C-alpha cells in the first residue's frame, strides 16, 4: 500500500511538471528558436562566398610587414531563405560568381530567378539565428564584415598529385649510405610480424596529396577595399587563385569584434585599415 501511494504521488508530480513545461514552452517553432537565441545570447550570421585573388603584403599599424590574401566578394546574392515552417530550421543560401545563362543549367537559372538574382556559379548554405535572416535577392558586399574581425575560411587545397611519404607526411627517409640503395626516400616498415599480421588502417603512406576541403580558423581582416569588395585577410587561405572560398564568422573568436547584424545597412566606399588598439603586440622588451 505504501509503495502504491508513493507511485501515485510521483506520477502526480511528473504530470504537474510536464504541464508546467508545456505551458512555459513557446507555441511555434519560430518562437522557440527566438527564445533559444535570446537565452544563449549568441547571434549566428550568414556567411558568404569569395574568390581568392592571390597574395600580397601590407604594413600593419605597428609598422610590421604582414602577408595577406585578397578575397573578393563577386556578385554574392541570397538565393534562398529557410525557416522552420518550410525546412525545419533557419538557414540562408547564398550564391556567387556570375554565370553565363546559356552555360548554366535550367534548374539553376530558375532557382536564381525565383530570388530575383542572376544565374550564379557557386552556392553555399549557412545556418543562422532568427535575428540574422536576410531577404532573398539581397546582395552581400564587403561591408558585411568589418576590419579587425576574425573569420574562418574553407576551400579546396592545391592538388600535388601522387607524392611520397617524405613530401606528403614529412618522414625522415632512409640513410644515404651504409648499405642503403634505391630506397632512400621510402617509408620503411609498415607494421609488425605475424601478430597482428596486417597493416593498420590509416597508416601514413605514399598517395594523392592535396585537392581536399580544408578550413583555416581565426584569420583576421586587416583591410577592406569597399570599392572593389575585397577583404585583405592576414595569412594564407587554402586553394589556388580564382578559387571559390567560403567565409563565415570565426567560431573561436579571439575578440568580440563582429560584423553588423544581420548585415550592413548600406554600402560603403573607400578603404578601411586596421587601427591601433591596446598595447603593441610585438613588444617583447622595454628599456628602463
Indicate residue ranges for each PLM-predicted region.
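Extended basic (Lys/Arg/His-rich) segments that typically form rRNA-contacting surfaces
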Residues: 2-288
